[in-house]
């Protein structure tokens, strides 16, 4: 996947890009089945909600051949090389479950705030790519963004260790209110929540302010996140476990574009 000048301009202005149906139904079925298998594991990389439901599976690409293919997929890697102008490595890989009825909130935050404070990442030359494994609906905990908020740099944040089972550097209500007011568009809205079918992809800037509400519906909302960082911008502090913030800065070598599809068809033929 190659980004056009118009897409790059939109990313620089809005802070994110949305690509509906980036992966096929066959590819996503393979990934979804693998996600269900991984979320059933009892491993240290599986972070759980306070209820015990799976919240996040970290580093799945290190113990799943299927997710190892996704972590090297050219549809995700090539646009990042294009934006950063250099090779990238996997800083973090996570599967967020947002389980039906039990998926908890992710508070308003900037990802680069964590990467800088906890991991010593020098600059926001890293970003997230979100791959929808389930349909993301307006009511099952969609990602919410404040457009253009990446332009304000890294904002002051507090370390919230109590709201959910996962500690997070979060923004206060006054900051979020101000950013939303300044982002209001022609429709009078300062927040967007992209929705779409499984296989859709969002790429967003490391400083873009975002959150997601709890999922109180019967509809699960699994999303895989790749955090890709420019190799020259690798982290310098190792306060978090290696399976949360990776220390292998080797440039990603992409697989063939049809690698996931071939794996899915091979599995179906078994």
Language-model-detected regions and their locations in the chain:
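A short secondary-structure junction signal
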Residues: 104-108, 117-119, 139-145, 154-158, ...
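Double-stranded beta-helix
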Residues: 139-208
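Non-heme Fe(II)/2-oxoglutarate
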Residues: 41-46, 52, 198-203, 207-270
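Extracellular structured ligand-interaction cores
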Residues: 92, 124-130, 140, 191, ...
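Non-heme Fe(II)-dependent double-stranded beta-helix
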Residues: 1-14, 19-121, 239-240, 244-258
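Short, conserved beta-strand element in jelly-roll/cupin
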Residues: 118-138, 195-198, 227-230
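Short, solvent-exposed loop/turn segments at secondary-structure junctions
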Residues: 24-25, 95-98, 136-138, 150-151, ...
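Short, structured patches in soluble enzyme cores that scaffold and shape functional sites
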Residues: 94-99, 110-112, 127, 131-135, ...
């Amino acid at each position: 996947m190659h980004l056009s000048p118009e897409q790059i301009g939109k990313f620089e202005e809005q802070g994110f890009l949305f690509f509906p149906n980036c992966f096929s139904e066959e590819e996503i079925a393979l990934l979804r089945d693998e996600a269900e298998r991984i979320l059933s594991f009892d491993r240290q990389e599986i972070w759980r909600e306070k209820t015990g439901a799976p919240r996040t599976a970290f580093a799945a690409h290190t113990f799943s051949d299927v997710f190892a293919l996704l972590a090297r997929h050219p549809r995700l890697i090539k646009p990042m090389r294009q934006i950063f102008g250099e090779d990238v490595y996997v800083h973090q890989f996570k599967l967020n479950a947002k389980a039906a009825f039990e998926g908890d909130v992710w508070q308003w935050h900037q990802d680069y705030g964590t990467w800088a404070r906890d991991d010593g990442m020098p600059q926001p030359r890293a970003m997230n790519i979100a791959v929808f494994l389930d349909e993301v609906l307006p009511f099952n905990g969609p990602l919410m963004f404040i457009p253009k908020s990446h332009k304000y740099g890294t904002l002051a944040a507090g370390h919230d260790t109590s709201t959910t089972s996962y500690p997070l550097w979060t923004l206060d209500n006054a900051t979020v209110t101000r950013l939303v007011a300044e982002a209001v568009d022609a429709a009078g809205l300062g927040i967007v929540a992209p929705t779409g079918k499984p296989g859709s992809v969002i790429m967003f800037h490391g400083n873009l302010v975002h959150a997601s509400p709890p999922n109180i519906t019967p509809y699960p909302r699994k999303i895989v996140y790749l955090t890709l960082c420019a190799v020259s911008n690798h982290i310098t502090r190792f306060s978090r476990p290696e399976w949360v913030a990776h220390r292998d800065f080797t440039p990603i070598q992409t697989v063939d574009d049809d690698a996931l599809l071939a794996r899915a068809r091979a599995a179906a033929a078994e």
